[in-house]
A protein has these predicted regions:
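Structural recognition of alpha->loop->beta junctions
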Residues: 21-38, 176-186, 208-217, 276-288
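Short glycine-enriched, charge-decorated loop/helix-capping segments at active-site entrances
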Residues: 128-129, 231-238, 304-310
Length: 350
């Protein structure tokens, strides 16, 4: 009965009244107010200096990182037999290591909070607040310590990493260059997330990191490829420059995995809009796609838009896109196995 209830994170922005209805004495801290925990709990370590990375040690067995995924082990076994790496690479492409931020061998670094965008459907800004970058020295301190601990895969976390530095006089490419130099190019960095428009604006400066494989992954959510839908989402209706960047990555075979997210069933979406999105996905050749059914969020601009797509139709449209994606993944894995076996046979013949 003497315990104190503290509710924070995104919930206070959406459910404050409900929380207080259940627990009138609860302390409510908005996301931007989390530093107040220092005083509430008499913290020995200030909140602002706490690392985002939740796993301080490599997961290991007999001093070697292991993975219990049977499919991945099969791919690795075929690679060993064929003296190649096609199958494991194809596995990473076809699954995108979907939950790689949960992998024990990755080191996560929070580099920014919030998003400068104003998408009509998004509640992130309400829950987290205005965009702000994390101090670069603090980021590099974590990066250096991660290297010392033996990590070589780092994930930059944030709601909009592409905007990093705009409020503190630096840029994402400058941060990446510093990381590259510090690791002597021996580490890899994954970016979660970067807005398509920002990626386009930074593309010329980012290409070298894609080409070298230093940036081995990024997630950039297009949400839709329909100008009409994008306009209602309060996003740039011209997705073509972004598609051309993705095509350039594909043409040059840059070793970077491309991940996107789409929303199906946004108010006003019609079948032609879905086809435009599918065509964009085909052209971009993303290695992984998250398909989300639209659902309104209270207090957002889209909350008042009339829903025009039934739940049944949303599920059908999402299933259509998902099925196409699965066919692509299967073809990719089969081609990788075939290539490995043919290369192995050729080496044996020689």
């Amino acid at each position: 009965p003497d315990s104190r209830i503290i509710v924070s994170g995104c919930m206070p922005a959406f459910a404050k009244a409900r929380v207080l209805g259940v627990s009138p004495q609860a302390t409510i801290l908005k996301y931007a107010e989390l530093a107040q925990l220092d005083g509430i709990i008499s913290a020995d370590v200030p909140f602002e200096t706490v690392y985002y990375n939740a796993r301080p040690m490599l997961k290991s067995e007999n001093d070697s990182i292991y993975d219990t995924d049977t499919d991945l082990q099969l791919m690795r076994k075929i690679d060993r037999l064929s003296c190649g790496r096609f199958c494991e690479q194809a596995w990473n492409v076809s699954t995108l290591r979907k939950y790689m931020w949960d992998d024990s061998e990755t080191f996560q670094i929070k580099v920014s909070y919030g998003c400068p965008g104003k998408c009509s459907y998004c509640a992130t800004k309400l829950g987290i607040g205005d965009f702000r970058s994390v101090d670069k020295d603090f980021i590099m301190k974590q990066f250096a310590e991660g290297l010392e601990m033996g990590y070589d895969h780092f994930i930059l976390m944030g709601d909009e990493i592409g905007a990093y530095g705009r409020d503190i006089g630096t840029t994402l490419p400058e941060l990446l260059q510093q990381m590259y130099d510090k690791s002597e190019g021996k580490a890899v960095v994954s970016i979660r997330y970067i807005h398509p428009d920002i990626l386009v604006s930074l593309y010329d400066k980012m290409k070298k990191f894609f080409a070298s494989g230093f940036v081995n992954y990024f997630c950039s959510a297009i949400q839709s490829a329909s100008p009409a839908v994008l306009k209602r989402m309060n996003r740039n209706p011209d997705i073509e420059p972004f598609i051309r960047c993705m095509e350039d990555i594909n043409k040059n075979n840059y070793p970077v995995s491309k991940h996107t997210q789409i929303i199906v069933g946004f108010p006003g979406e019609v079948s032609d809009d879905v086809l435009m999105t599918m065509d964009a996905l085909r052209r971009c050749a993303f290695e992984h796609i998250n398909i989300n059914l639209y659902s309104p969020r209270q207090h957002t601009a889209a909350w008042d838009m009339k829903e025009t797509v039934t739940q049944k139709e949303k599920i059908f449209r999402a299933g259509l896109i998902s099925y196409s994606m699965k066919l692509y993944k299967k073809a990719l894995l089969y081609d990788a196995i075939k290539t490995s076996l043919l290369d192995s046979r050729k080496r044996n013949d020689d």
